């Protein structure tokens, strides 16, 4: 959460972190991020191309900022009341000081498109809205960087 806050990406505020030694895991207690997930919005009939473009720019921004979120999907992306996109359920998020490499970007985008209804919303009716916004946010040729 700190890495996201440093990059001004809306996210839940961590209240406590608990280590569970026997399971070799951690649990997080946090204050929820206000808003609705994109999955909630699209299942309620949201069809705004501007939101698709905003999503493309948001994901590109995450990748350029060194944010690798293994659980990236529309159920973990929130549209906040002020119109910004943010992330929830961020326990498996990793942050580095440099843009994530191409192979991880591709894996992340594949995961984003895993749910059939999510994929249908992102790609329909104009499949280029998300792609165009993603690539423009990265700049000419940036998507092919290693």
Please provide the spans of the model-predicted regions:
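AlphaC helix of the protein kinase catalytic domain
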Residues: 37-46
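Conserved ATP-binding subdomain of kinase catalytic cores across diverse folds
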Residues: 1-37, 54-65, 69
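Active-site beta-strand-loop-beta-strand hairpin of nuclease catalytic cores
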Residues: 81-85
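A short, local hydrophobic-aromatic micro-motif
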Residues: 12-15, 75, 110
């Amino acid at each position: 959460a700190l890495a996201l806050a440093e990059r001004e990406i809306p996210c839940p505020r961590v209240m406590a972190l608990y280590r569970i030694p026997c399971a070799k895991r951690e649990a997080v207690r946090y204050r929820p991020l206000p808003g609705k997930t994109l999955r909630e919005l699209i299942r309620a009939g949201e069809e705004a191309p501007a939101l698709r473009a905003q999503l493309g720019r948001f994901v590109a921004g995450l990748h350029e900022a060194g944010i690798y979120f293994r659980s990236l999907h529309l159920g973990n992306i929130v549209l906040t009341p002020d119109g910004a996109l943010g992330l929830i359920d961020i326990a498996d998020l990793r942050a580095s000081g440099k843009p994530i490499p191409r192979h991880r970007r591709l894996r992340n985008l594949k995961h984003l498109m895993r749910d059939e209804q999510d994929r249908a919303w992102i790609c329909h009716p104009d499949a280029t809205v998300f792609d165009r916004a993603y690539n423009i946010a990265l700049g000419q040729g940036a998507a092919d960087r290693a």
